[in-house]
């Protein structure tokens, strides 16, 4: 949620979270553990970023007969921003340069909060200075997804030099 807010031109520092929870019907310790661990993880990140949650909605009865919804906690980021500072993800014109502001998780696969804060501050400053005209927060499809979605908007292609083994790495927290 934070990287999407930043990629659109806003600062994460005044952002607020809202959550949507989808979990199976709670019937035993294991089923109760899924939302508990997800919410504890969300709380940990809220504390580390110093950002509150303003609410959310739960769907804890995501079971129909023997079919359970996949367990998921979806985070939304909400903030205000000067409309003149908002950017969109598509490449604007031929000759745009693409730069990856990469987040590297810690060895235990947790986010490197210090690195994220520094990266997001830098991206926000560059958007305000109008040095960044397009932004995309990497997710499940990694760099490959980001490049495709950014180039489809105005029918522009992109030529990149990158290790093809890493094109589909998740890249959560990174911004192109």
List where the protein language model places each region:
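Small-aliphatic-rich amphipathic alpha-helix that forms the alpha element of a beta-alpha
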Residues: 1-17, 38-48, 122-125, 146
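Short loop/turn motifs at secondary-structure junctions
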Residues: 11-13, 94, 131
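Glycine-rich anion-binding loops of enzyme active sites
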Residues: 16-103
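Glycine- and acidic
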Residues: 17-29, 108, 128-133, 173
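Glycine-/charge-enriched secondary-structure boundary and capping motifs
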Residues: 31, 35-49, 54, 58-71, ...
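A general structural motif
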Residues: 76-82, 113-120, 159-164
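A glycine- and small/hydrophobic-rich beta-loop-beta segment
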Residues: 92, 100-103, 108-135
């Amino acid at each position: 949620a934070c990287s999407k807010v930043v990629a659109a031109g806003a600062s994460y520092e005044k952002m607020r979270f809202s959550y949507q929870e989808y979990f199976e019907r709670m019937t035993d310790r294991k089923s109760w553990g899924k939302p508990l661990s997800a919410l504890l993880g969300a709380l940990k990140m809220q504390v580390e970023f110093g950002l509150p949650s303003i609410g959310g909605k739960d769907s804890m009865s995501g079971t129909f007969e023997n079919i359970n919804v996949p367990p998921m906690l979806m985070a939304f980021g909400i903030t205000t921003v000067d409309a003149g500072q908002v950017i969109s993800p598509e490449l604007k014109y031929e000759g745009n340069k693409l730069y990856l502001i990469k987040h590297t998780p810690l060895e235990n696969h947790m986010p490197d909060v210090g690195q994220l804060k520094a990266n997001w501050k830098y991206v926000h400053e560059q958007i305000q200075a109008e040095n960044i005209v397009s932004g995309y927060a990497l997710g499940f499809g990694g760099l490959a997804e980001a490049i495709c979605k950014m180039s489809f908007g105005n029918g522009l292609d992109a030529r990149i030099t990158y290790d093809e083994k890493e094109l589909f790495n998740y890249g959560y927290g990174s911004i192109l």
